[in-house]
A protein has these predicted regions:
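Local sequence-structure signature of Cys/Sec-based thiol-disulfide redox active-site neighborhoods
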Residues: 3-36
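Structural micro-motif
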Residues: 50-61
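Non-catalytic, surface beta->alpha helical segment in thiol-disulfide oxidoreductase systems
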Residues: 60-97
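Short glycine-/acidic-enriched loop or helix-start segments at secondary-structure transitions
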Residues: 22-23, 47, 69-70
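Extracytoplasmic/periplasmic, Sec-exported soluble proteins
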Residues: 38-39, 50, 77-81
Length: 97
């Protein structure tokens, strides 16, 4: 479960139904953020708006601004770890103080 902190940090995982075997399950374990999942096949405008070229892609937003992006490799599997993404979230929070 992701607990919402004082900032507006949001982590969005973009994927597609045909690639559901590569969903990033640990996203739900991130803390101090809001989490969302967008299926780009169901919401193609989101794919265009955020220039999603490969799935899955995880984007960290702070107050609506993209801070960091993690993209899958050629095998459609993401190489970033939960620790990598959480470190960016923690850094964003630390910089707010």
């Amino acid at each position: 479960m992701c607990f919402f902190a004082h900032s507006q940090i949001e982590v969005i995982q973009y994927n597609a139904g045909w690639n559901s075997s590569n969903d990033v399950q640990w996203c739900n374990d991130l803390i101090d953020c809001e989490i969302d999942y967008i299926d780009i096949a169901a919401k193609p405008k989101q794919q265009v708006k955020y220039k999603i070229e490969v799935v899955p892609t995880i984007i960290i937003f702070d107050d609506g601004e993209e801070i960091e992006r993690f993209e899958a490799d050629i095998s459609f599997a993401i190489q970033a770890t939960e620790e990598d993404v959480q470190a960016y979230i923690d850094e964003i929070l630390a910089n707010k103080f």
